[in-house]
A protein has these predicted regions:
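Short loop/turn segments immediately following the C-termini of beta-strands
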Residues: 76-77, 86, 131, 141-142, ...
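Structural signal for beta-propeller blades
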Residues: 79-81, 144-146, 208-209
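Structural WD40 beta-propeller signal
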Residues: 66, 129-131, 195
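Conserved beta-propeller blade signature
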Residues: 70-73, 135-138, 198-201
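Intrinsic N-terminal pre-sequences and regulatory tails
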Residues: 1-26, 52-54, 59, 65, ...
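Gly/Pro-rich loop segments of beta-rich domains
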Residues: 18-59, 87-124, 152-188, 215-230
Length: 230
């Protein structure tokens, strides 16, 4: 059965110092897309088989660019994150860094096994984070957790430093298997954001937003603020 090949489009922009509350460089350009990632030819945007590789994507849902020039994509359908050390300047530039799967040609929820510090299950939101803008946060939605690197990965398979939403990296149940949520649990977190001082997570399945003052430092750290529920 044919699937839809997804593209991520971006435009080169002049480098400039980022604002403290928004460390990502802008991606959009008024002239339209200048670079296409996810396929070598824009014509492949129609039905085509999606085979995992350093160039392909399947249903990417999150993207961010850091002030150091690195570029990151949540390749949601392949259950992985792709990273480029520098903002790509040519169509079809292969990714340099792979997170969530063993090699580039493999895919599957939690790499075909259970949740751990090396796997992902429907990663969606992604954001540069940390007061110095050096970190990375990924909303690993169907593992009901957010993965945090205090320093962005510089090589493939680099493990996250902290997980929130679960008590450890081996947990993968919604609300940690409890019948009710609390300040330390998540259920389908689909979006994550950093405002320069606080981490925000859209806890979609629990119909609320959670906030942490500063970047969480320990696994399972509870949120400091809950919006949307009592």
């Amino acid at each position: 059965m044919a699937t839809i090949t997804a593209h991520v489009s971006l435009a080169p922009v002049a480098r400039r110092a980022p604002a403290a509350a928004a460390p990502c460089a802008p991606l959009l350009h008024p002239a339209g897309a200048q670079v296409i990632l996810g396929a070598t030819d824009d014509a492949l945007g129609m039905a085509a088989p999606v085979v995992p590789s350093a160039k392909s994507m399947f249903g990417p849902r999150g993207v961010c660019a850091a002030a150091d020039g690195s570029f990151w994509v949540s390749d949601t359908g392949h259950h992985r994150v792709l990273g480029w050390r520098r903002l790509p300047e040519a169509d079809g530039t292969p990714a340099d860094i792979l997170l969530g799967q063993p090699p580039f040609d493999r895919e599957g929820r939690n790499a075909g096994g259970n949740a751990n510090e090396d796997t992902m299950n429907v990663p969606t939101g992604i954001a540069v984070c940390g007061r110095d803008g050096a970190g990375l946060a990924v909303a690993d939605a169907w593992n009901h957790r957010v993965l945090i690197w205090h320093r962005r990965p510089t090589q493939s398979y680099q493990r996250p430093d902290v997980v929130v939403g679960q008590s450890d990296f081996d947990g993968g149940q919604s609300n940690r298997g409890h019948s009710q949520p609390d300040a330390g649990t998540l259920f389908w977190p689909y979006c994550v954001a950093w405002d320069g001082e606080r981490l925000w997570v859209a806890d979609t399945g629990n119909r609320r937003v959670l906030m942490w003052n500063g970047l969480p430092q320990i696994n399972g750290q509870p949120a400091d603020l809950i919006i949307g529920q009592d």
